[in-house]
Amino acid sequence: MTVLKPSHWRVLAELADGLPQHVSQLAREADMKPQQLNGFWQQMPAHIRGLLRQHDGYWRLVRPLAVFDAEGLRDLGERSGFQTALKHECASSNDEILELARIAPDKAHKTICVTHLQSKGRGRQGRKWSHRLGECLMFSFGWAFDRPQYELGSLSPVAALACRRALGCLGLETQIKWPNDLVVGRDKLGGILIETVRAGGKTVAVVGIGINFVLPKEVENAASVQSLFQTASRRGNADAAVLLETLLAELGAVLEQYAEEGFAPFLNEYETANRDHGKAVLLLRDGETVCEGTVKGVDGRGVLHLETAEGEQTVVSGEISLRPDNRSVSVPKRPDSERFLLLEGGNSRLKWAWVENGTFATVGSAPYRDLSPLGAEWAEKADGNVRIVGCAVCGESKKAQVKEQLARKIEWLPSSAQALGIRNHYRHPEEHGSDRWFNALGSRRFSRNACVVVSCGTAVTVDALTDDGHYLGGTIMPGFHLMKESLAVRTANLNRPAGKRYPFPTTTGNAVASGMMDAVCGSIMMMHGRLKEKNGAGKPVDVIITGGGAAKVAEALPPAFLAENTVRVADNLVIHGLLNLIAAEGGESEHA
């Protein structure tokens, strides 16, 4: 899985809480000289390397990680009444405890195995548990019951309830999706897999738990402890050791009670925690709907009760998955006039705007990992007169995600050779980023002069448009995040805390921040000078800036430049371009 050595794991454990650590201490953990640490750090996985910040001899990570050291884990386990084992890498933490349970069931009881990486981690229904180092808190433990296996059907929801209690102790509000998923709305925070072994006259339940500690970059519809911690306005960062100790305390107390009294004492609490109680749901097997109805509740065996068209039905977990039934949302009627839903598919986020009578009615956005707000708005606002028109540079897979939320054809518009009286001089218009084209079309909402059109996103684009309607092309450069990331990953000494912009920076962090902004501002001013020369003496050339960093870029341009030229910050420029185009189709056009 990785080629990390014990010294790498020790250093990671020292830094995992996100607090500053002096290089002398880290060097002792790595058994090397402090000046060797930078080269040593380059051996870390790429997603870990970029988290490091250095300042005045101290190292820290910009976010905490779920990484432990054996001694600290042992102390934590003793306080909670558990024996501990730490496996930096293994096939499956459940397999580790299952093997122990088969050999010595008494030893498996209250023995916990924590792992940082699993090659064969799994969830319910054989699904693979995906994770990267440090993103997920993963552990398994054994619990011996003096009961046969068939009497433990409610253990799964009880374990989920214990985890929810623990998270509540830390101020984090969660729900449970039957039978045992920890969720925040539609986003999954964690899952539980329980496997059992019958040995020595006892049933040993092996409880495997995985909780997203930081938001997993490659997993859609996910929540994390760290993001919840910040949403709850808690000071500082979440701590994986505190989280694990709180979980073990609640799991121990709840399972002790469950072993004596069963599920009955927990039923009311579970009903409150159940996200879908009283709501319409679909039950799926292998992706196919096998049943639909309204959740009535869960009984003492952990069995789900549904009210269906055929009457009440009961469902055991097995190979069944539960999903909210969004088809039941009523759709309000709208006037018969044509309405539009305009989409801008950027690299990292989707933006959309509802257009009625030629104006924006509602504007929204969401990351691709959770487009449910778009789906919810579609269910609420759509009718038979809505036409969906979009521009996308995000790739086919993300466009497919958008399509899943909208029950209608999407007209994805490419760049064209000409539109709205503007001629596109790009050599191959089909290769031209459609966002750049619609930014140019949208700029006519704000200026009829020649203008430099700037978009600050994942990439920064700087394009030229003449006053007589010739789009001349332009430049593309990395955005601020990509510039910072490339310095962090590709250099030994420039992975520093974010600095501030100064005329004459005297620290490395400030030099990096100032250099990145100067690069963008310099590119804008270079393009402005070229366009002004081409446009002719005495004729104005405006600057239109859009995107997340637009205001900061406008502020950073030299005062003399701002005094001599018109510089405007325009939100949603692509959507303005789409609106201009469809308005022209209807005989109207937006003007400045």
From Swiss-Prot:
Catalytic residues in the record: D435
UniProt keyword annotations, A-Z:
ATP-binding, Biotin, Coenzyme A biosynthesis, Cytoplasm, Kinase, Ligase, Multifunctional enzyme, Nucleotide-binding, Potassium, Transferase
Q: Which residues bind substrate?
A: Y426, G433, S434, D435, R436, T508
Name of the protein:
Bifunctional enzyme BirA/CoaX
Q: Pull one GO CC term from this UniProt entry.
A: cytoplasm
Known catalysed reaction(s)?
biotin + L-lysyl-[protein] + ATP = N(6)-biotinyl-L-lysyl-[protein] + AMP + diphosphate + H(+); (R)-pantothenate + ATP = (R)-4'-phosphopantothenate + ADP + H(+)
Q: What does this protein do?
A: Activates biotin to form biotinyl-5'-adenylate and transfers the biotin moiety to biotin-accepting proteins. Catalyzes the phosphorylation of pantothenate (Pan), the first step in CoA biosynthesis.
Mind telling me which Gene3D superfamilies this protein's record contains? 2.30.30.100, 3.30.420.40, Bira Bifunctional Protein, Domain 2
In residue numbers, the region (Biotin--protein ligase) covers 1-329
**Gene Ontology terms for molecular function:** ATP binding; biotin--[biotin carboxyl-carrier protein] ligase activity; pantothenate kinase activity
Query: Where does the record place the BPL/LPL catalytic domain?
Result: 83-259
The subcellular localization recorded is: Cytoplasm
Identify the Pfam families for this entry.
BPL_C, BPL_LplA_LipB, Pan_kinase
Annotated region Type III pantothenate kinase: where? 336-592
Provide the taxonomic classification: Bacteria, Pseudomonadati, Pseudomonadota, Betaproteobacteria, Neisseriales
Q: Where does ATP bind?
A: E344, G345, G346, N347, S348, R349, L350, K351, T458
Family from the record: In the N-terminal section; belongs to the biotin--protein ligase family.
- Pathway of action: Cofactor biosynthesis; coenzyme A biosynthesis; CoA from (R)-pantothenate: step 1/5
Q: What is its EC number?
A: 6.3.4.15, 2.7.1.33
Gene Ontology terms describing biological process: coenzyme A biosynthetic process; protein modification process
Task: Kindly list the cofactors needed.
Answer: NH4(+); K(+)
Q: How is the cofactor bound?
A: A monovalent cation. Ammonium or potassium.
